[in-house]
Amino acid sequence: MDVSQFAESKGVKTALEAAALAAANTALRNARVVTPYLTQQQTKNLLELFRGAQLRFEPRDNWAHPVQRVVHDALEQYVRRAAGPNCLEVGAHPRSINRHQASHRCFLPPVGRDEQRWQVAPRRGLCNLIRRALLNGVKVAREFCQLGFGACSHQCEVGIALYSLHDMRPADVACAMARHNMRTMYVVLHLPEEAMLPPGSYSNKFYNTVNTADKCIITYADDSCAGYVHKREVLQDWITTTGVSGRHPMLIERVRAIGCHFVLLCTATQPCPMPYTPYPSSNTVYVRNVYGPALGAGLFTPKCCVDATFYPVPRRVWQRLMMFGTTLDDDAFCCSRLLTYLRGISTKVTVGNIVANEGWQPEEQQLTAVAIAAYLTVCHQRWVRTQGIARGVRRLQAEHAQQFWFKVWELFTNTGTVPGYSAGFYRQLATWISGGLTIDFERRVFDKRVKCGCCCVCERRPADPGCLCIDDFPDGANGLVKLKKWPIRAGTKSAVSKWAQVRVRADSTEDLIDLSVPKLLTLKELAAAAIRKQPSAPPSLHILDRRPVGDPRRPVNCAPPAVSAGPVPAPPGNPVIESVQGSGAGGPEVSESQPGLTPTREVTNMPLPPQRGQEEVLAVLPSGARVIVGNLLDVAADWLVNPANRDHQPGGGLCGMFHRRWPHLWPVCGEVQDLPTGPVIFQQGPPKVIHAPGPDYRIKPDPDGLRRVYAVVHQAHGTVASPLISAGIYRAPARESFEAWAATARDGDLLVVQRSMAQHIRDFVLNEGRHRPRELHVDRAMADMVNYGLATEPEPYNELVKGVEVAPMTVKYALIAGVPGSGKSSSVDHRGAVVITPTKTLAREWSARGATAVTPHVAASAAPEGRVIVDEAYAIPPHLLVASLRRARDVVMLGDPHQIPALDFDGRCLTSAVDLGLQPTSWRTVSHRCPWDVCIFLRTDYPTITTTSRVLRSVVFTGETIGQKIVFTQVAKQSNPGSITVHEAQGSTFDQTTIIATLDARGLIASSRAHAIVALTRHRERCSVIDVGGVLVEIGVTDAMFNNIEMQLVRPDAAAPAGVLRAPDDTVDGLLDIPPAHTDVAAVLTAEAIGHAPLELAAINPPGPVLEQGLLYMPARLDGRDEVVKLQLSDTVHCRLAAPTSRLAVINTLVGRYGKATKLPEVEYDLMDTIAQFWHHIGPINPSTLEYAEMCEAMLSKGQDGSLIVHLDLQDADCSRITFFQKDCAKFTLDDPVAHGKVGQGISAWPKTLCALFGPWFRAIEKHLVAGLPPGYYYGDLYTEADLHRSVLCAPAGHLVFENDFSEFDSTQNNVSLDLECELMRRFGMPDWMVALYHLVRSYWLLVAPKEALRGCWKKHSGEPGTLLWNTVWNMTVLHHVYEFDRPSVLCFKGDDSVVVCESVRARPEGVSLVADCGLKMKDKTGPCGAFSNLLIFPGAGVVCDLLRQWGRLTDKNWGPDIQRMQDLEQACKDFVARVVTQGKEMLTIQLVAGYYGVEVGMVEVVWGALKACAAARETLVTNRLPVLNLSKED
């Protein structure tokens, strides 16, 4: 298709210009800002170095090394983001200490240039503290050391080194990483290619390099100060090395480079072939000067091509020169022509604005050397070409001159039929000029592998007495000396056989030679040095037979000679040799009587190694298994476990020790049991060994596989001694390996750990659940810094901490860390503790759970004593945290080091200056909040995170706004009403969230991944991401990323049910199969049938009633909301309405229900005879543990943890206060729902202490009542609808329904009802003090609302622990005392509601006085049918659900504003519909409801269809905004 006609379209041009402008704006907005002043050459160099990246120059700084520092800052940003904040930094520059966080910093003693840097270092924050400590000679501290990276042993998994390892070789770095137990290290190095050249001076447009015999000096272009000096050999090692092998393997990978500045990722793992080209874009060729400076006489001396000087030549110049010389005619080829052509192409040529030739400006000597090198190279190529052609022609002549039969014979004898090139006539040597006169680093490939430093110490320093890398044997994960075979020779008076082996330990104080230890291999030079050093007294030997089974030689027998009783021990620090008889085949036997051999135990007092069965026991598990410290190969057990590999080949570590001790066990054979990690082989030996390969955690963590391996191992008959399988080179956590072993360990089984792991096992594994508290040491310097922070606290917080001072102290704490949503705060017991939170939002959440929560400034001022809980400890400023804990006795901290740390809002740098170094005492890795996709995304930050959530995909990029809005900056918070920042959201949980990333948060998100972690881990179900500017794309939060995560997630299958599934009950005949109906149609029909009009008012506050008794406490302001907004099914409701949010409505309810005078009769009523009519066999009972368990289950179901239950003290308000809450009426009515003139309803909650005291008793009494009721009685809800339906269906014909509903039932109860309750409690055996306490609390009480209070007496409160029980009992007592029922068949009682199906009913004469004296208000009626507790009673027809009442109550509810309320509506309708349908009473229900209310059957069918529509989530909701009419007088 031809689109040329659109090329000149204005719209197309405009669109292209707009797109280009947008791209330019985006590039400039995201560009790297370059702040130093630069020369023109430096600017060009930076643009070329950062090719592909946008730079924006905003000069404002004067730097000595501007180009290098810009490169340094770029690589530093990448490295710190990759390493995270809790890393170890090697050789940190003083200016970076206050800006960046690190767990530890390693320095060398400041000398020379370092001394200058520390003298001019910043005089504030942590940098100033370290500067003063270094200059005062402090060697080691928590935050730093000046031992150097190679000598320090601070434990840290990740490290960084920014231009600080130019003096350490890769092998030494590998050993240092092992000492630090470091797995990953990011190393930034300056590695110029000129370091690979011989001594000389080399220049390019970026820098000048001067190579001396051992130094490499680099000075960058236009720099104003001295350059950099490095060791050439070290630079060459870093350039050529890609891996370190040996005991401390390391893999080196180049992950980023800017020019010759590299970021090397050093990983502690086995190296693999990784050939690489370090300078793939080098545009320089180095040409050799064949003359050579100061060489011997003669051009072709052997070293002329090795030590010659090289000149850098632009690649384009050299390629053009070689092309010209190669293509010249033989007659025209000469050196002068090459020199003339070289001079010509070295001249810059410009044609207009086009540079035709960039030019080159060489020196005279350089020009001559290049021309000569080119001439010699072309000469050599021409000679090779001539020789090749001549030999080829002779070969062709010979081939064509062959006879026929010779050709046939050659055809059958030659295997190859395709002729190749014959180059056998010439072979080049490396020292020849013909071997090449140029070095081209663009084509150089390096893949060198060296051995770690501790492996080569004996070869480099043969006189050294020991090795720096000495750790426990045999696991060797932290760096053990290389052990080699070295037979003992002459030099001692001992006659030891040649095949004995020695072991050297430089730190030992044992005998010079001791053969009582297992056979080990040793260092050659150290052994020789130890043997040459003669002790003052003959050494004593103890030779132990360690020969293989079946060795025919006699065991060595050492006869003890007469020696002096006091041998002189070797001086401490000298090497000590331990020798063990080897398994070699040759060598003379040791004679039975040797004068130089003396039993060690009889002569010396030196300590001996632990003997078999005498190892140190760390712990004994309940199963009888033991954890011991010792050598696995010497443990007395039936079976020894060898942590083998999958191929069962002799390896390193403990597996290698098994092979060296018992080589006859290989090849492995025996009983095999296959596992996914590899076959487990039971070998009979001797000794009996179980070869058990564990899972490789370097590939994938597999706790289940580890448990399976231990389970198979512990199936062996007899005791089993195991190591921590997979905890060595396979990198499994020691905790997981221990837990897997402990899960299946039996009585007598052993877990053998080495000495260096003992403390780790004791602290973090064996003491799980009772972690040893850590200590926070506050020295004088830290206390001064804390006091400085408190004194300079900004307004308005300075008034809170005014006068607070902190002295040096030590605080013991336990820090529970874990992944987001792991239940850190919900699992801690906050009873009696003060909770310190960083934000008010978090404090309110703690207060809602019943805790005493304060913010850090309040805590610093109050200094709480006793138990203190610190939530989100890492987010609290350290000086406030220290000040808050100065009086605390028991401190529990909660937090996550990967989330947002304490922020330095006011720029005082106190966060970095006061480094508390908090270390977790326990880690939790199971999240109960985060969905699966979020967990997978966070695996880089939390490698072992898992979740119990069932949500697979939760993060969406649809642009919708749902749930709580979370932003990153205060500006964005002001632009998005209702939103909160990530700092405020930290520690909170929401069902749905919306993350809004604005452009002003780019720097915050790019510099701190913790902010994104907090934002992504706040939701349970769904998270909508709105990222218009692509801010979150930089950290990988994209739709494509989460789509890939969703594809990777394995959807778990539902677990099989424990029992047999029961199908839903089959419905009986009577189903109408009515389809769902429109809810708005049902609402209109219901309004017409009942006669209710659409609402014009949300509620009416009637005039307040008169306070007849009690004392009322009123707030200063009686305000409330003037309008109500609800999302409802209709604008017409059928429930009595009130205004629960109005303060006047609350006071009206308090006074109307509990402020009226209570009538107290002058006569006493004995109602026990009345109770005997329905309650028989009242006698003493005791609540069992079942009632207490039911109480605990009820508390847990409501989210309570029992922390609100306190000691019984009536003077304590928490123990005696009754709390009042106003609630919606939601009472279905056929009268006017608004102008009803009645007060609202409320809930009175008793304190949890009294509920826990009386609750189990009342529950036991209730069970006794229900169990003893006569036939036909139905109590509360403790029956099934089917039983009630059957009883009503079987009622005799002609029976009537008597129903009664008390008015003001609670407020009319007085001393008569209370005395009755107390009398029943006494007869059931309740202690007298409890009865008296109940009578006291019920008689005189204080009802406390949020802002109001009422002090009164008598009455009944709905929140009492026995509300339903005693209200129902009082209801039954009054009805049986006032009325007499003839032939009752069904009697239902629940609270103040009651229904009796009987033949007739008449009033008792004695009941009139009870009603009058107690002021009872009874609303009774008798008819052919009645209503009871949302049920309609029709004698002879049965019991059906009240459809119209259910629909009317739904119209009053507010089903907004979130999706959760709509789901509640759907679930409620589903339950109601299922309740009707499963009983097969759909037709009966519709008919009886229509008959009860006197409406059309069709209308009830539409209501039934509307309920079905709501159950199917097909309802229609309307928003009603209505005013509240206030008729009360506020004065």
From Swiss-Prot:
Its cofactor is Mg(2+). Residues 240-434 are annotated as: Y-domain. CDD domains: Hepeviridae_RdRp, Macro_X_Nsp3-like, SF1_C_RecD. Its EC number is 2.1.1.-, 2.7.7.-, 3.4.-.-, 3.6.4.-. SMART domains: A1pp (SM00506). For methyltransferase activity. Residues 561-600 are annotated as: Disordered. GO terms for cellular component: host cell perinuclear region of cytoplasm. It holds the Pfam family RdRP_2. GO terms for biological process: DNA-templated transcription; methylation; mRNA modification; proteolysis; RNA processing; viral RNA genome replication. Residues 1049-1531 are annotated as: RNA-directed RNA polymerase. Residues 925-1058 form the (+)RNA virus helicase C-terminal domain. Residues 803-1046 are annotated as: NTPase/helicase. Keywords: ATP-binding, Helicase, Host cytoplasm, Hydrolase, Magnesium, Metal-binding, Methyltransferase, Nucleotide-binding, Nucleotidyltransferase, Protease, RNA-binding, RNA-directed RNA polymerase, Thiol protease, Transferase, Viral RNA replication, Zinc. Contains a methyltransferase domain, a Y-domain, a putative protease region, a proline-rich disordered hypervariable region (HVR), a macro domain (also called X-domain), a helicase domain and an RNA-dependent RNA polymerase domain. Belongs to the hepevirus non-structural polyprotein family. This is Non-structural polyprotein pORF1. The lineage of its organism: Viruses, Riboviria, Orthornavirae, Kitrinoviricota, Alsuviricetes.
